[in-house]
Amino acid sequence: VEIALTDGGTLSAAQVNDLSVAGTANCYVVSAPGTYVFNARVRGNGAGEGVGFEPAIEMADGMTADWLWTDSEGLVSGVALDTTSGDIFLTVGEGRGNALVALMQDGKVVWSWHVWVTDAPQTMTYGNGTVFMDRNLGAAGTTAGGTDAYGMYYQWGRKDPFYGGEKTETSANAFLEAKNGTVVN
């Protein structure tokens, strides 16, 4: 079966790994280079009462898909939408990091998904039975003190992560130094 994509390319269904086969989500973990697909007809996992939005997304003319940002050069490419199936396809290269992939209608973001490329996270069970991942959400590594262990930053009320940076600030006015050049200034 050949799949026609909005960027003009085609893919064979046998070449594609389905990220949403076990269910839809706002974040997908990818652990190896390859071509991937996920269901873009559902916002997040589509569940919940009173979430304030319609979970179903209807495909329409003018819809496209692309990546909005990545913290690792060349991490994702070939992002395309199949408007017939409502699936987004992307190719993940070598390396580790994060990307934000979006479904757009006439250039405006309809919904976005965090694609986290890392070796498969492991779980750790504490003495009291609490289970955690072995890394921060979005972290490329697990080395204590290493900048690849920082992960992503989240703001209350937002589902999409922000890039965590590659260094720490230790001076007394670290906040002021960290925000220089942002919209706040």
Question: Predicted regions span which residues?
Answer:
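Surface beta-loop-beta hairpin patches that serve as ligand-binding interfaces in beta-rich domains
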Residues: V1
